Regions:
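Positively charged, polyanion-binding regions of nucleic-acid-associated proteins
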Residues: 1-14
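Short beta-edge/loop segments at beta->alpha junctions of small alpha/beta modules
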Residues: 11-88
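Short, charged/polar micro-motifs that form catalytic or ligand-binding hotspots
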Residues: 28-31, 35, 115, 168, ...
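Short, well-structured alpha-helical interface segments that form or flank functional binding sites
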Residues: 37-40, 124, 173, 177-180
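Short gly/ser-rich loop at a beta-strand->alpha-helix junction or flexible surface loop bordering the NTP-binding
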Residues: 57, 74-152
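Residues in well-ordered beta-strands of folded domains
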Residues: 60, 114-116, 157-160
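Hydrophobic alpha-helical interaction segments
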Residues: 133-241
């Protein structure tokens, strides 16, 4: 990818939307001070789907067209519905370890079901789930996972739900948005095996999906990871083909 295209895509990733004039005034590349040259690059990136035109001379970054629409297993449905019946006013979400697989380079057999519950109710939820399941863990850290958990054996993991987490509803259940999922994989200690070089690859593969970067960055800010998440996101798009 040429340095000029890298410059434009990085600029687009940093801004929710931008005009041709914005780019022209901000440009650190002397070639882009000529509007005809700049327009040719904007047209090229728009035709390739790397930018989208949303108005006269206004652009947003264009990511993949795939939507994050994971299949929810019967066990996840049963446990979520059980908890929701016990705690109808408590915010919660459910997801599965196998949803991570499409993003990974080194595949891991994670068959866990994760239930995130409001902090004040999460320990109560843990004890309630233990009435149904024997293989249940409450907020396990790296040491506990390495010593006691076999993720391939379908454990249930109860965690605290971060306030104002971006969630969506699917088949009557609340699940994480992909934006939340990506940030949590970086921040949560129980996802230690996804961090480092593997996480960069996960973010690289996430460019195939439709991502609301404003939503992702707001949530990353709540988790005190904004600058690191932004840097990895911007670096990973440069090599995405």
């Amino acid at each position: 990818m040429s340095e000029i295209i890298k410059y434009i895509t990085n600029y687009a990733a940093r801004n929710e939307s931008f005009s041709a004039s914005d780019l022209l005034n901000d440009s650190g590349f002397p070639y882009l001070t000529k509007r005809t040259v700049m327009n040719s690059y904007l047209s090229k990136l728009t035709n390739e789907g790397k930018l989208h035109r949303v108005g006269r001379g206004t652009y947003v970054i264009g990511y993949g067209n795939h939507c994050f629409n994971p299949e929810i297993g019967e066990k996840s449905k049963r446990l979520y519905e059980f908890l929701k019946q016990e705690f109808p006013l408590v915010n919660m979400c459910v997801y599965e370890g196998q949803w991570i697989t499409p993003f990974m380079y080194h595949l891991a057999n994670n068959q866990a079901v994760y239930l995130e519950v409001e902090k004040d109710a999460s320990e109560y939820a843990f004890h309630k789930i233990k009435e149904l399941e024997g293989n249940v863990f409450y907020r396990p850290d790296k040491k506990e996972i390495e010593k006691y958990l076999d993720l391939s054996n379908g454990p249930v993991i109860i965690k605290n739900l971060v306030t104002e987490s971006p969630l969506c509803e699917q088949n009557g259940l609340h699940i994480p948005t992909l934006e939340k999922f990506l940030v949590d994989m970086y921040c949560d200690s129980d996802f230690y095996y996804l961090q480092g070089a593997e996480y960069w690859r996960i973010m690289h593969n996430a460019h195939q999906y439709s991502i609301n970067t404003s939503k992702m960055f707001r949530y990353a800010s709540r988790r005190n990871a904004l600058q690191k998440i932004k840097r990895i996101w911007e670096e990973s798009i440069n090599d995405f083909e």
